Amino acid sequence: MKRKWERDLGLQGRMLFTMFLLAAVYLFFLAFLSYYGTSQIFIILFIGLFMAAQYFYSDKMVLWTTGAQIVSESEAPQLHGMITRLCAIADLPKPQVAIVRTQVPNAFATGRNQNKAVVAVTTGLMDKLSPAELEAVLAHELSHVKNRDMAVLTIASFLSSVAFYIVRYSLYFGNMGGGRRKEGGGIMLVWLVSIVVWIVSFLLIRALSRYREFSADRGAAVITGQPANLASALMKISGVMDRVPGDDLRKVEGMNAFFIIPAISGSSIMDIFSTHPSVEKRIAKLEKMQQEMS
């Protein structure tokens, strides 16, 4: 049975405002580069080519980086059964299913759209969670698919990286079109502006990522009808992470932005620099939803 997908208007508003600010920063940056002598055609071609590559191949890169293996229904019947059932409720096409063989208990979703998605879980996650908790985590990842979070965050993060490398390239290899940048202090001004743009975009992307994690938690609660199951899963994953060997955590640290909980142990990082809200905040929101649904 399909469930009504109710939106959190406050959360949606904060996400839209953050995306608006990010777009404004990028437009300012590109206009600034153009004014100071960087060719507009070069910028458009450079961004266009790399965005296309990122859009079409990001899922393959993520699977290769993590060592995730696509599994068939015969290889993982329980996992496929859960995802098939959840997709019917969420009104989603069924994604490919993958397993990562690592002790780190985690999960992620990737793919450029709802028809080209992959949901992956680790063997550590399947070993540690109950079926109800595993289903809640899968629902969280499917919420990312439904909200197209992978495409949104990939594009947002990519533009930040492109802005940085365009400036770096221009500083090393000349004026890329001539103009005002040759005037005194021009190179230093471009460098200073690039630093400011990178810092601001970095913080905005982190904020956007945190909002979308909250949104995926809410989506999982709606799909399963049991917010408490996801809260329980988050507590277990967070607790187990502290006992996972450091070498295992370091092997997957590049995937932290994709995971349901970052693969870190010990001291936490400041919320403003994190891709995910704190587990405590997420659990508090889920507990509130559980009370509202009861």
Swiss-Prot record:
GO terms for cellular component: plasma membrane. Zn(2+) binds at H140, H144, E213. It is an enzyme of class 3 (hydrolase). Keywords: Cell membrane, Hydrolase, Membrane, Metal-binding, Metalloprotease, Protease, Transmembrane, Transmembrane helix, Zinc. The active site is at E141. It is found in: Cell membrane. This is Protease HtpX homolog 2. The gene is htpX2.
